[in-house]
Amino acid sequence: MLQPKRTKFRKMHKGRNTGLAHRGSTVAFGQIGLKSLTRGRMTARQIEAARRTITRKIKRGGKIWIRVFPDKPITNKPLEVRMGKGKGPVEYWVCEIKPGKILYELEGISEELAREALTLAASKLPFKTTIVKRTIM
């Protein structure tokens, strides 16, 4: 699963997910992409589950770009532990997703197959998404 090799600090504040995605909001590498419509968190497991779904659907053809990376650690205290005594250990990694962020891109397969693969992948994700095509200027 995806996670940073090393970080400057082990733990992070919770923070708030506000605003829209300006960077990473256009299809840059492939021809068709999966774009988020709502905000949320995408865990490393969800990124991998969606990637596997796309890979299985398109079989050997085409190329996949994963445009998100889980760089935020989420901590959790064990069950039945009293409050205090510091922040819990890191449990998993997430990527904060803002509306408009491109999550996956595909190229080298038919548009119909790409739409099917991205629709299957979208069902694995905890927020609403849409399929967008690359706009050529």
UniProtKB/Swiss-Prot annotation:
Q: How does it assemble?
A: Part of the 50S ribosomal subunit.
Q: Which UniProt keywords apply?
A: Ribonucleoprotein, Ribosomal protein, RNA-binding, rRNA-binding, tRNA-binding
**Its domain of life?**
Bacteria
User: What InterPro entries does UniProt report for this protein, alphabetically?
Assistant: Ribosomal_uL16, Ribosomal_uL16_bact-type, Ribosomal_uL16_CS, Ribosomal_uL16_dom, Ribosomal_uL16_sf
Q: Name one GO biological process term.
A: translation
For this protein, the record's SUPFAM superfamilies field holds: Ribosomal protein L16p/L10e
General function of this protein: Binds 23S rRNA and is also seen to make contacts with the A and possibly P site tRNAs.
State a GO cellular component annotated for this protein. Answer: cytosolic large ribosomal subunit
User: What's this protein's family per the entry?
Assistant: Belongs to the universal ribosomal protein uL16 family.
Keyword Magnesium annotated:
no
Q: Which organism is it from?
A: Psychrobacter arcticus (strain DSM 17307 / VKM B-2377 / 273-4)
- Disulfide bond positions: none
Q: What Gene Ontology terms describe what this protein does at the molecular function level?
A: rRNA binding; structural constituent of ribosome; tRNA binding
Keyword Ribosomal protein among record annotations:
yes
The protein here is known as: Large ribosomal subunit protein uL16
